[in-house]
Design a protein with these regions (language model features):
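PP2C/PPM-type serine/threonine phosphatase catalytic domain
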Residues: 2-255
Length: 255
């Protein structure tokens, strides 16, 4: 799915403040999450396929995004070209994972989610695949911008499952889309206008599996460092069965 938004002529807005943390879950031996935090691009990748394989897969896609950054930040590039670059980057990430799997058979089956937001010319570009999430807090209203690529979300979309039944569903963690080196991917690429004061949250499902939107929204109304620490603390208080990565960024005017 792809929605484009043309250049918006207004006061240039950027990520004026960013805070983040990544922690190991209480039932995990290592952290398979990877993250990217820069002035213009934020991303969370949640690896799967065993600790070693999952960590390699998530790190691989983050490294691909880092390699893409200089091109994305070229001031002569327009937003449509940036959207094309982000969209095509999914193929190169997936190919890189496939190449690693071919060279190391013990890693076949590894994979990762990817949820990223890029901010250029006061336009926010969301690139999403899997069940990590992106939220926007505007005032006191929180909105999920990403859409889970999971079996249970498909059932909800089809009207065959109620959202309050997710926690007990045997396939609650089954993904329908992930970067696993198997091609045939349909990432979400969406564009949003931003407002000064907007806050954006990127997180792995280690957070959203145990916290609801009301808890997330309340925590995000604190200063950014406190917001991140509160979200992590609440996750641990809820049992933290999975690794948890949280990035919170606020929109402000360029200096």
């Amino acid at each position: 799915m792809r929605v484009r938004l043309g250049n918006i002529m207004a006061a240039k807005l950027n990520f004026s403040d960013i805070a983040w943390r990544s922690e190991v879950g209480l039932q995990r031996q290592g952290n398979e999450d990877s993250a990217l935090v820069s002035n213009s691009l934020l991303a969370v990748a949640d690896g799967m396929g065993g600790y070693v394989g999952g960590e390699i897969a998530s790190r691989t896609v983050i490294e691909k995004l880092i390699q893409l950054l200089p091109t994305l930040e070229n001031p002569e590039l327009d937003n449509e070209s940036r959207e094309d670059l982000l969209s095509s980057s999914i193929e190169s990430m997936d190919a890189a994972i496939a190449e690693i799997g071919a060279a190391r058979p013990e890693l076949v089956g590894m994979g990762t989610t990817l949820t990223s937001i890029a901010l250029f010319d006061s336009n926010l570009l969301l690139l999403h695949l899997g069940d990590s999430r992106a939220y926007r807090l505007r005032g006191k209203k929180i909105e999920q911008l990403s859409h889970d690529h999971t079996v249970v979300q498909e059932l909800i979309d089809q009207g065959r499952l109620n959202p309050d039944e997710i926690a007990d569903h045997p396939q609650r963690s089954f993904l329908t889309q992930a970067l696993m080196g198997k091609e045939n991917l349909s990432p979400i690429l969406l564009a949003y206008p931003v407002l000064k004061g907007d806050r954006y949250l990127l997180c792995s499902d280690g957070l959203t599996a145990v916290l609801d939107e009301a808890q997330i929204a309340k925590a995000m109304q604190q200063d950014l460092t406190s917001a991140v620490n509160s979200l992590i603390d609440l996750t641990y208080k809820a049992g933290a069965p999975d690794n948890v990565t949280v990035i919170v960024a606020e929109i402000g005017e360029s200096k």
